[in-house]
């Protein structure tokens, strides 16, 4: 006499999740393990399907969504430095990159893609040590034993990729510094950043920037440049006098202040005229006289 085989539930990754009683299936409830496999497989597929974007917009979207793995200057999955816009687009749209992303996801799962960071206690630290003997995230390699892992970490390939990763950090910092210098991306006077040249142009002809320019010229006229840079102060926050450690609310107040006796007393090294003449060195005071010697 033949008996029917126990029912099985197929997991989303194609493998059988194991036998379960027919009552569980009839109730329409999946065991927790199967639900987890289905959810994980769905999320994994969504990430993998977007591993090979097409066009600039999709590439930028992928970088923004997965900044822990991809940047404008480095692909951390492939350990590749991207020194130009064309190289960046070509790399992220390549089949080779997509295959490495799939392999990376198979090893590390979804946590790295989401940028999740976990606080490690002593147990987790020991787990990390075990993971190190199983795979190398820098070189995207897996090992069959701790001996093979140790051999890899002492080899030339790992040393080369590690050096490449360290250099990429410097390239990113240099890229950020260049953006700070580029007037189409950053206004050092107002501490404002821009996404495109059109936005930058609108800022430079705007009221806020012109006000800051007026402030800068005024302070230069009254000898303020002898103090630390005016740009140290937040944009639009009054008219600061670092010498006296006060902030004036208007141009008129600032003019009156720098022309006054109190401000000049606080500036023993220079005397600036209200007409904006070049600051002159004050001679030593003798017999309570404030007369300057020629």
Curated annotation (Swiss-Prot):
It is found in: Nucleus, Nucleolus; Cytoplasm. It holds the Pfam family zf-met. There is a cross-link at residues 114, 170 (Glycyl lysine isopeptide (Lys-Gly) (interchain with G-Cter in SUMO2)). The modification N-acetylmethionine is found at residue 1. Gene3D superfamilies: Classic Zinc Finger. GO terms for molecular function: double-stranded RNA binding; enzyme binding; miRNA binding; RNA binding; zinc ion binding. Residues 267-276, 283-294 have a biased composition (Polar residues). Its main location: nucleus. GO terms for cellular component: cytoplasm; nucleolus; nucleoplasm; nucleus. SMART domains: ZnF_C2H2, ZnF_U1. Signal peptide: none annotated. Forms a heteromeric complex with XPO5 and ILF3. Found in a nuclear export complex with XPO5, RAN, ILF3, ZNF346 and double-stranded RNA. Interacts with XPO5. Interacts with ILF3 in an RNA-independent manner. The zinc-finger domains are required for binding to dsRNA, and also for nuclear localization. This is Zinc finger protein 346. It comes from Homo sapiens (Human).
